[in-house]
């Protein structure tokens, strides 16, 4: 599962990992994926200018299953996926060169406060940070308070493109919380 963040889940799986102690059990996500994720530029895909494509073959299934592999365990040399959270996802190709954005809704078994969620995000670190690897972002996840963030134009290169930007964290009427995550798909991937 080492390449799991290389895909479309990199804008939300690390966020959910930071919140694991609150036991997220149901997730709805829509990803808005840059054309570079398809190996394209606007020069060789001009029909994407001013357009969206509401289907990316195979991405939705990966978006729902790969986080469970990431959070699973190894038994007898085989990855056994986690059983929770249940994830449903739609993946949309958007006219952006670099940067995958995700709009995510989450239900928790132990509903946290907004302050607890933000605290876990800004203090989250993993093995790359502990090992102080040269490409590891010093602060893996940043939280942006402004209502109009994260934005691809302003935030995709956070921590040299290796970090994740999160914003728009607010309570939801159907789920517990919702947020928007952004990551650089070609630098992180």
For each feature predicted by the language model, list its residue ranges.
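Alpha-helical support elements that line or immediately flank enzyme active sites
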Residues: 6-24
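Short, small-residue-biased leader/transition segments that mark boundaries at the very start
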Residues: 1-5
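Short, structured patches in soluble enzyme cores that scaffold and shape functional sites
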Residues: 6, 31-33, 183
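C-terminal substrate-binding/catalytic lobe of Rossmann-fold NAD(P)-dependent oxidoreductases
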Residues: 25-177
């Amino acid at each position: 599962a080492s390449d799991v963040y290389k895909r479309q889940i990199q804008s939300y799986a690390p966020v959910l990992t930071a919140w694991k102690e609150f036991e997220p059990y149901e997730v709805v996500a829509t990803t808005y994926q840059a054309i570079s994720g398809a190996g394209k530029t606007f020069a060789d895909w001009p029909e994407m200018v001013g357009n969206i494509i509401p289907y990316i073959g195979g991405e939705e299934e990966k978006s729902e299953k790969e986080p469970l592999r990431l959070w699973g365990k190894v038994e007898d040399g085989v990855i056994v996926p986690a059983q929770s959270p249940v994830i449903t996802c739609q993946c949309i190709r958007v006219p952006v060169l670099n940067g995958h954005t995700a709009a995510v809704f989450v239900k928790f078994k132990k509903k946290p406060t907004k302050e607890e969620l933000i605290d876990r995000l800004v203090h989250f670190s993993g093995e790359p940070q502990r090992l102080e690897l040269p490409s590891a972002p010093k602060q893996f996840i940043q939280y942006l308070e402004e209502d109009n963030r994260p934005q691809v134009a302003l935030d995709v290169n956070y921590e040299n493109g290796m970090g994740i930007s999160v914003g728009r964290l607010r309570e939801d009427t159907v789920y517990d919380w919702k947020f928007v995550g952004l990551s650089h798909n070609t630098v992180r991937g």
